[in-house]
Curated annotation (Swiss-Prot):
Membrane-spanning ranges: 25-45, 391-411, 447-467, 475-495, 509-529, 534-554, 672-692, 709-729, 737-757
Name of the protein: Vacuolar membrane protease
Coiled-coil residues: none
Residues where Zn(2+) 1 binds: 174, 186, 246
Positions annotated as glycosylated: 59, 115, 118, 237, 805, 846, 954
Region annotated Disordered, chain positions: 579-620
UniProt record similarity statement: Belongs to the peptidase M28 family.
Cofactor: Zn(2+)
Keyword match Cell wall biogenesis/degradation: no
């Protein structure tokens, strides 16, 4: 007799069986492999090609040198360095155009240095406050590359000239930076990408079919002024599609932030390394993302259709002095450039008419109308894009078909008497005898585990929010590790305990059924949002549910391999009768403890492998007391055939542990099919969305936003990521869960006690200095979160001995603290004039009131600046800027009136002439947007402030207070601007 026959409990190892070792090993490998790929996609930027492998017409070495030159200093609109950058860009553009002109086959190129356009508008479309007026003068640089199919005439030179033929393509980047950042990614990489696009499309063989407009806009950082004033240039009537290149982080991959429609998004598929998700765009729709880009002007004002591509992380370097070339790399530059080349090449080569049909809004270009889209990348190598309507239709179909298929399958199982799910027992014909099936075991196990693990994860989110709320700022992956490890350990522990006391072969089927129900509800919610609000962010729930449905269906189909319940019950009853007969014939009746464990009180089999002596050649094949129906065919009903010991051995080897004895015919390999159907797609899509969310939001705490939303996202996405493990986790060995328990303990301690900021992940604190020119006093204000703001102020020498005046900040948990600081030197005084004494002469203004009317003319000029503003204690009804254009597409004023007018000019120390009227549209007395009472505007008086701004921070000693803060602030603090100006000086005025 063979060894296997000699010992019935010896099992041949099956590497794919649903047993602990294969389940633990294969599941761990699958999860690790896909998770690592997702992480690599997010953390590793594709390498830039060598010079030899670069596309024809692209020079990355030149692009990197351009970026280094561009970021040599701060260059906000209101700085001398900004003029230098403007001149340098013109020089670089002219050099590239000359080189292309020298070569044969190059296209015509026209360069417009726009020093004529200006615009007055209200910022109601950007900010929540609708009553801030803006006057802005353009210093944009516009480059037009004529396409081979464009109108050959210079139509822009004619009075009221309009382009003929198909619309062109606009690619935009802004060359101004903030006053506290060098602008390497915001938006230096976009600017040098435009220079390389100019070189690429003027290279022989790369001539565009449709015209290409490259807009180097100036003034984006201050209310998107550069893009708005572009609307006054003739080229704004020519372009129908656009690609906006932005930077809201400081490196990594350039992300497709949002798009207007499906049709234009399809051109992004041409990108060599696509990266992004529709989730970000829906964040803007839902108001979760407050900042804006030029995208809203090109689409909302001009009616163009296009894409917004931006760097998104790390935000701790955004708008700080670490947004420089040293803290980014050529790989990130290449990623943005390759995206720009691929997308733009597709747009300028398109021959269809999708972007040239008429629109219902006559104030916008005829770019046609698109459809809402769904899009996401896969490992940064492939890109999926389709219509939201398609997703809606598929979702509705699947919501109906999924339950219907399972229902029909359940009916078929019931008809064939194999529906063990929800079956407690089986009656034997008309007799009162019943056989226990134990089919309800494991029914409520999965919802209990899901609830407990999720509640614990959310509890940890609350704990972090209370104890160390900003740890995610620098330790995002420590938080992820804590959430994931505790979820898996708790789920494993609960599943193992449940399996120990109530083992069930139906654990997988019940788990998938519950996950099916939960994901069905998720898909219903996602589908409703998609249909009613056009929100596509729940796209992953469709694929999640589809995979869960297939995996659940496999579990239901498995049940067809089981014996009929009636057949199993009859065989169990026969065995009981034979056992009773055999036992009564014995001389000694064994005690209850000696009865075989597979005989239950009602005659059903209990499973298990009780200790017994090994059979010998003289042992009966019936094995005495352990009879079985293993020899009977599952399709038989009444036939009884002699079975062999070999069948008995196969049966014993097929039943796992103490699970139901009827389960021995279940396939042992289908769990792998279910794992591969569900786990990879869930990890890829859910993991991508989870990482995108937490990466974008991990550092929102420095902006005053509660970080609980980040921890909650980690908790919920942990559940979504590892819910596919629930059908298998009870089979895991203890090694992986115990290891994860140790990781949880370590990361929990770290997350609770570690300092949340570091030199690599600094806390942003916002600076402004305000000077009262009437009495010469000044105050330095820092805005940030407590207690770290106080720690920073305590390190500043000029604040020593003073009590900082702290008030609630402009948003969320931000606090603003002020003290008397070092006086600024933004205006060079005449020798012998001590500028620390007031009054200063930095601002000149004159106010003339029209006799008999509530109208006045205010003339304002500031020294060494080109940015000022008028702030009124009560809103004025209307205003006009001398020489300004007004565009009816952009709101000029509002019914609430205008409480502030911001003035920007391309000329240094310019004089603005502003006419205001506070009579034609009076504002209700005693009302203000902040809820504070103001003076009765029915009076014929108007009071307010004349303020000028200084933003040039390139020379040490000009703003000593800022130099001091940077020098003495802790290494984990980054200084960013609090407003348009670093220094604001003001005079009070009253018009009587």
């Amino acid at each position: 007799m063979s060894p296997a026959m000699a010992n019935p409990r010896v099992r041949k190892f099956n590497p794919i069986a649903f047993t602990p070792l294969p389940v633990t090993f294969i599941t761990t490998i699958v999860y690790l492999a896909v998770l690592i790929l997702v992480l690599v996609t997010y953390l590793v930027v594709p390498p830039a090609p060598t010079l030899e492998m670069s596309p024809k017409g692209v020079n990355l070495t030149e692009a990197w040198r351009d970026l280094q030159h561009l970021t040599e200093g701060f260059h906000p609109y209101n700085s001398r360095r900004n003029d230098d950058v403007h001149a340098w860009l013109l020089h670089r553009i002219e050099a590239i155009v000359r080189e292309s002109a020298a070569a044969d086959g190059g296209p015509e190129v026209f360069v417009f240095d726009d020093n004529l356009s200006n615009l007055t508008y209200s910022n109601g479309g950007v900010s929540k406050s609708p009553i801030v007026g803006v006057y802005f003068e353009s210093t944009n640089i516009i480059v037009y590359i004529r396409g081979s199919e464009d109108d050959p005439q210079n139509w822009w030179e004619w009075s009221n000239g309009k382009p003929k033929g198909k619309g062109g393509v606009l690619v935009n980047a802004h060359y101004d930076s903030v006053s506290t950042g060098y602008g390497a990614t915001d938006d230096g990489m976009g600017v040098v990408s435009l220079l390389q696009l100019l070189r690429y499309f003027t290279t022989a063989g790369n001539k565009p079919r449709k015209g290409l407009v490259l807009l180097f806009n100036n003034g984006e950082e201050d209310y998107l002024n550069g893009a708005r004033v572009y609307s006054q240039h003739a080229m704004s009537n020519f372009t129908h599609t656009f690609l906006n290149l932005e930077g809201a982080g400081a490196g990594g991959r350039a992300c497709l932030f949002r798009s207007t429609d499906t049709e234009v998004t399809r051109f992004y598929k041409n990108a060599k390394h696509p990266f992004g998700s529709v989730l970000a765009g829906d964040g803007f729709k839902l108001g979760l993302i407050r900042s804006q880009t030029d995208y809203v002007v090109f689409n909302g004002v001009l009616g163009l259709r296009g894409l917004d591509v931006s760097f998104i992380a790390p935000r701790s370097r955004y708008h700080t002095d670490q947004d420089d070339a040293r803290h980014t790399n050529v790989d990130s530059l290449w990623h943005m450039l390759s995206v720009a080349i691929g997308t733009t090449e597709g747009l300028v080569s398109y021959t269809g008419t999708d972007f040239d049909s008429k629109t219902t809004d006559q104030d916008k270009v005829n770019s046609g109308g698109g459809t809402l889209g769904v899009w996401f990348d896969i490992f940064g190598s492939a890109f999926a894009v389709f219509r939201l309507h398609t997703l809606f239709a598929l979702s509705v179909t699947l919501l109906v078909i999924g339950p219907l298929v399972l229902f029909i399958t359940s009916i078929a199982l019931s008809k064939t008497d194999r529906m063990y799910l929800f079956s407690m027992s089986k009656s034997l014909g008309g007799a009162s005898e019943t056989v226990s099936l134990r089919g309800l075991r494991g029914l409520f196990r999965t919802p209990i585990i899901l609830t407990v693990t999720t509640v614990i994860s959310i509890g940890l989110a609350y704990l972090l929010e209370k104890i160390n709320p900003y740890i995610v700022h620098s330790s995002q992956f420590a938080v992820w590790s804590m959430m994931l490890s505790v979820w898996i350990f708790v789920a494993w522990f609960l599943a193992r305990v449940a399996d120990f006391f109530r083992p069930s072969a139906l654990h997988r089927a019940y788990s998938y059924t519950w996950i099916f129900i939960v994901t069905w509800i998720m898909l219903v919610i996602s589908t409703v949002y998609a249909n009613q609000k056009g929100i596509a962010a729940g796209y992953f729930t469709f694929f999640y549910f589809a995979a869960v449905f297939l995996a659940t269906w496999v579990s239901y189909l498995e049940l067809f391999s089981l014996p009929r319940k009636g057949y199993y019950a009859r065989q169990a009853s026969r065995r009981q009768r034979r056992r009773s007969s055999s036992l009564s014939s014995r001389l000694l009746t064994p005690s209850a403890d000696e009865l075989p464990s597979d005989i239950g009180p009602n005659g059903a089999e209990n499973v298990g492998d009780p200790d017994e002596t090994d059979p010998t050649e003289s042992t009966s094949l019936l094995r005495g007391q352990r009879t079985t129906f293993a020899n009977y065919r599952t399709g038989g009903d009444d036939g009884v055939t002699e079975y062999t010991a070999e069948d008995e051995h196969v049966r014993e080897a097929s039943i796992f542990g103490h699970e139901q004895s009827w389960s021995w015919t279940l396939p042992r390999w289908t769990w792998i099919l279910q794992l591969l159907l569900l786990a990879p797609i869930v990890i890829i899509l859910v993991g991508q969305v989870g990482l995108l969310l937490t990466t974008a939001m991990s550092q929102i705490g420095s902006d005053g936003v509660s970080t609980f939303i980040v921890y909650l996202a980690c908790a919920l996405f942990s559940t979504l990521l590892f819910a596919p493990l629930l059908p298998f986790i009870h089979r895991f060995t203890y090694h992986v869960p115990i290891f994860l328990l140790l990781i949880f303990i370590g990361t929990l301690i770290y997350n609770l006690v570690a300092f949340p900021f570091s030199p690599a992940n600094r806390l942003k604190i916002f600076f402004i200095q305000e000077v009262n020119l009437d009495d010469g006093t000044n105050k330095v204000s820092l805005t940030g979160i407590q207690p770290y703001l106080t720690d920073t102020i305590n390190a500043i020498p000029s604040a020593a001995g003073q009590t900082a005046n702290c008030t609630q900040g402009p948003f969320g948990s931000l606090v603003r603290c002020s003290w008397s600081g070092l006086p600024p030197r933004v205006v060079k005084e005449d020798p012998g004039n001590d500028q620390t004494m007031g009054p200063y002469t930095w601002i000149s203004y004159n106010i003339t009131r029209t006799v008999g009317k509530n109208e006045a003319r205010i003339k304002v000029s500031g020294r060494n600046t080109r940015a000022c503003k008028l702030k009124f204690d009560n809103p004025v009804a209307d205003y006009r800027i001398s020489g300004s254009a007004v565009d009816h597409r952009l709101p000029h004023t509002s019914r609430q009136g205008v409480e502030e007018i911001r003035l920007w000019t391309r000329t240094w120390e310019n004089t603005w002439v502003v006419d205001v009227d506070w009579h034609s549209n009076p504002v209700n007395p005693g009302e203000s947007k902040d809820g504070d009472e103001k003076q009765d505007v029915s009076k014929n008086e108007l009071s307010g402030k004349v303020i000028c701004l200084w933003s040039d921070n390139n020379e040490s000693g000009v703003i000593p207070a800022l130099d001091e803060v940077r020098l003495y602030a802790p290494a984990w603090v980054a200084i960013s601007k609090s407003a348009d100006g670093l220094v604001e000086a003001s005079h009070d005025f009253i018009i009587q």
